[in-house]
Amino acid sequence: MANRPTLTEIKMHSRIDTDYEDDYLIALDNSAFDFIRTYLNRDLVLDNTAELTEGQIYYTEQMRICELMLVDSWYTNRSSSEIPKACEYMLNQFRVMNT
């Protein structure tokens, strides 16, 4: 079970020293979380004491790292449409494909 990245952690990961794009970084982070949820086709549960129901999965450290990687990728390459390969490999183990 992992916690969502803080703004400070996002900025450290992306080596950002300024504050003027904080709102943009928060928006990217929320988008990254939503992307992961959609990519996995599962609801992400942050509370590890909650009982999971069908279609849910606990938010893991791998997902947290992918969230940081996505924010960094989208911040650095603002027109990028690809996800980092390492992120894709980490997330695929949790992905549920529609049938």
Predicted feature residues:
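Divalent metal-cofactor coordination and adjacent catalytic microenvironments
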Residues: 1-99
